[in-house]
């Protein structure tokens, strides 16, 4: 049982770390988008090179924003049975009857808990894998955005 708890904690820690990185980098992504919007008049009046760089920058910014949202809001598969350790399943099952929820949770036997924990590890690992995939794509798009923002800054000086 301790091994499962350790694995569960490790997977959840990776998910938390991914979310924290996404929030930090996402704020810079949004700041870059605001910079683009503030300077749109200057960009439109500039030459063709600046406009092309701006278009590439906007595309990279939008792509990064989409990947950022996919990192923060992963889709969950709902084909698993109701879990006694997943907060949403617990809340949905006992929202109207908290006392029954407390009683039912106290009655969970070790084998049932072990199975629910293993199921949650699998589900969270799938979420972590998706987040990892989208973080890689976000970083690529964000890198293109940073490069093009730098080129825009130089061309507008």
Residue ranges and their predicted role:
Residues 2, 6-20, 85, 119-133:
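Short amphipathic alpha-helical coupling elements at transmembrane boundaries
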Residues 1-8, 44, 103-110:
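Short, charged/polar, low-complexity loop and linker segments
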Residues 7-8, 54-55, 88-89, 110:
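Short secondary-structure boundary micro-motifs
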Residues 5, 21, 42, 81-84, ...:
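Context-gated lysine
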């Amino acid at each position: 049982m301790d091994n499962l708890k350790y694995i569960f904690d490790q997977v959840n820690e990776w998910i938390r770390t991914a979310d924290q990185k996404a929030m930090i980098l996402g704020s810079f992504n949004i700041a870059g988008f605001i910079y683009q919007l503030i300077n749109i008049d200057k960009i439109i009046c500039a030459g063709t090179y600046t406009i092309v760089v701006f278009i590439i920058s906007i595309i990279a910014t939008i792509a990064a924003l989409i990947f950022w949202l996919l990192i923060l809001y992963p889709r969950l598969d709902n084909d698993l049975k109701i879990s006694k350790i997943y907060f949403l399943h617990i809340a949905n099952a006992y929202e109207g009857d908290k006392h029954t929820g407390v009683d039912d949770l106290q009655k969970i036997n070790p084998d049932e808990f072990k199975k629910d924990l293993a199921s949650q590890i699998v589900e969270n690992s799938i979420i972590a894998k998706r987040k990892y995939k989208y973080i890689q794509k976000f970083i690529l798009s964000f890198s293109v955005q940073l490069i093009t923002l730098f080129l825009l800054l130089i061309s507008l000086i």
